[in-house]
Amino acid sequence: MALKHCLRVLLAALACSPAGAQPLDAAPNGFDLQRPEIAEFVDRVVSHHGLNRQDVRAILKEAQPQPKIIEIMTRPVETVTPWWEYREHFLSGERISEGAHFWLDHKNSLEQISGRYQVPPEYLVAILGIETKYGRVTGHYRVLDALATLAFDYPPRHSYFREELEQFLLLIKESKLDPLTTTGSYAGAMGAPQFMPSVYRRYAVDANSDKRSPPDLWSDWDAILASVANYLHEYGWRASGPVLAETKLDPDPSFQIEPHNLELNETVESLGAHGVKVELAVPPDTPVVLISAEQRDGPAYRVGFHNFYVITRYNASARYAMAVHDLAQAVAKRVHDSSS
């Protein structure tokens, strides 16, 4: 296991430290393991999961605080760009072309995995295109540093990130990942699909075997595609179900659109009563959510269906889900056009 190998190296180095060197608790330039919240974290991990206390402390001693991450997390919210501008960023000609090439390079795997999980291949490709430009940009922060920094030096979300740090330690134990070299985003998301440790452990699958150990989500493309498909499948993706539809809008002036709502709290019929006509033939009782999708020339709206909601479970943003859908359609069209 990677954990045991890394710990043997770490503990050997500690054993060879010269007399008078800083003790383990001092953690020079790192985290002070005597801090109450860190000591409590170690106690919990050891008692809940049976990990060796010395092993856990040896790994945490290697974590380095990252002030830049705290700066990113506390940065004032900038003016939100309009949807059309957000869309242009993610639907560049380059990203569409790269997506089509990626699809053709992995055509057989995409067909098999799409059939197995009943998720269209274009959505698997689009998610990877938006998350990491098809695996090219997976993050440069050490995951150990990122998670420890947010777990112990970022009070607003320390509970969430302590849980993810705990999950990362378990992932290290179960996989071949090296805790000292594994890199990811500033929030600790990993690999081509940008899975957090808890998601990695729960949804990552090996496409070609029944092995239970977590797969490589950086270079094993069958596992990467299967893991994204499995994630969407587990959240209830409906085969052949719609994702988005355009609208014709003449709304009731009293009708309020909730800008951050992702829940399917309307139906096609209820929207119709407020002057919103859905440009897709679906039953009137179909649950939907109305989404603002402003264009260069003014307001516009779309409706999201169940599969749209499923995409927001990957990233809780309506604009993200719209971008995934639009990139999926653009890449699929490019692939179709190139083969006709």
Q: What do the PLM-derived regions correspond to, one by one?
A:
Residues 179, 183-296:
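Flexible, glycine-rich surface segments
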Residues 8-18:
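Bacterial N-terminal signal peptides
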Residues 27-28, 32-37, 44-62, 158, ...:
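A contiguous strand-loop segment
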Residues 85-229, 233:
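Acidic/His-rich structured neighborhood in mature extracellular/periplasmic domains
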Residues 22-114:
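An acidic, Gly/Ser/Thr/Pro-rich helix-cap/linker signature
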Residues 1-9:
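Bacterial N-terminal signal peptides that target proteins for export
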Residues 283-340:
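C-terminal functional modules
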Residues 64-65, 131-135, 189, 238, ...:
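Solvent-exposed loop/turn segments at secondary-structure junctions
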